[in-house]
Amino acid sequence: MAVKLLKGEEIAEKKAEELKERIEKMGVSPRLVLLQVGNYSAATIYARAKIKRGKKIGADVVLEKYEDLTKQELVRRIEELSADKDVNGIMVENPLPKTIDYYDIVKSIPYYKDVDALSPYNQGSIAINREFLVPATAMAVVDILKYYGYEKTTATIINRSPVVGRPLSMMMLNRDYTVSICHSKTPDIRSIAKASKIIVVAVGRPGFLDDTYVTESSVVIDVGINYVQDKVIGDIDFDKVSEKVEAVTPVPGGVGPITATNILSNLVKAAEYQSNTNIGR
């Protein structure tokens, strides 16, 4: 039987339509300010993609690009944007110069404008099952699994970062999955992965996960984005894995489109919250 491809574009489009309706109901375009420090072409590409998607739903997404800023100058700019009642979301683009620690910077963004959802408040809210704004990639994985009907089952996540593995493990626990989380020091990842219905991989290594990690009933979610010979590929050996498993996400076209939309979903939720509570105004 042919492998089932878990595509994300349709999910992203449906979410975008819902966001557009919510913005029309608000009567005001939510505003997201992206802060980029340094000349990183990949960061600029991702920022422009968010601007483009924002326009489609009626959101005002702007990029502030700086050749060089100190940590203190960047924090000062974040404080200015935090105090601006017309700004609903703030996002610092990765990577930053080596002299600036990303997570130190994120702590200075108010939780209700933190559309990347990496602040201690938003991460902690996930841990106690009181989700507010959630990391976009982790939410994209949850969205795909829900859309295709893979819920409340066993899952192995091969990643422990604050962007994917840690929040996703807690978000899946909140939704009654039974979760194992693996990392570079985990012995015998293959056995753990094979014992789970769902396998989520995000290790930043093209072709890392091959057919020795999976069974015929495995559902594989590939979060990896790698550039190899001008092509975008994931963290799995797609040809080998797709020959064996029940279902798999393609790269590109799987998690990616939903991730971009989920940033805007956080923006709209933040704007609604600020309007309803009058916080930050």
From Swiss-Prot:
Entry-linked PROSITE patterns: THF_DHG_CYH_2 (PS00767)
Catalytic reaction list: (6R)-5,10-methylene-5,6,7,8-tetrahydrofolate + NADP(+) = (6R)-5,10-methenyltetrahydrofolate + NADPH; (6R)-5,10-methenyltetrahydrofolate + H2O = (6R)-10-formyltetrahydrofolate + H(+)
Any one GO molecular-function label of the UniProt entry: methenyltetrahydrofolate cyclohydrolase activity
EC code(s) of this entry: 1.5.1.5, 3.5.4.9
GO BP term, example: tetrahydrofolate interconversion
Keywords from the named record: Amino-acid biosynthesis, Histidine biosynthesis, Hydrolase, Methionine biosynthesis, Multifunctional enzyme, NADP, One-carbon metabolism, Oxidoreductase, Purine biosynthesis
Pfam families noted in UniProt: THF_DHG_CYH (PF00763), THF_DHG_CYH_C (PF02882)
Pathway per the UniProt entry: One-carbon metabolism; tetrahydrofolate interconversion
Residues the entry annotates as binding NADP(+): N159, R160, S161, S184, I225
Oxidoreductase listed as a keyword: yes
Record family assignment: Belongs to the tetrahydrofolate dehydrogenase/cyclohydrolase family.
HAMAP family registered for this protein in UniProt: THF_DHG_CYH (MF_01576)
NCBIfam families given in the database record: FolD_Thplmales
Subunit-structure text: Homodimer.
Function: Catalyzes the oxidation of 5,10-methylenetetrahydrofolate to 5,10-methenyltetrahydrofolate and then the hydrolysis of 5,10-methenyltetrahydrofolate to 10-formyltetrahydrofolate.
Protein name: Bifunctional protein FolD
